């Protein structure tokens, strides 16, 4: 399965939402599983993520909606806390085949 899973709390804990594919905005979606943050808007509320894909894929999280602004890349298969500047400031995301990523989070 190719998913980007965002979590309300750090260390991939609390309520979660899983996205298959790109999300132009996180502001129309809600954390759905039981736990801290359930039914809260995903936009500007995620603290961590699981890039639930193979190692040749990348999950990219953006500060702004529409895949714009500063971004953070995470290599497939990794569970990470969002960096301080992006924690609770997430607005959109995309995932793609990258052959592996380079930069922070990889």
What does each of the following model-derived ranges do?
Residues 1-106:
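Compact beta-sheet-dominated domain cores in extracellular/mature segments
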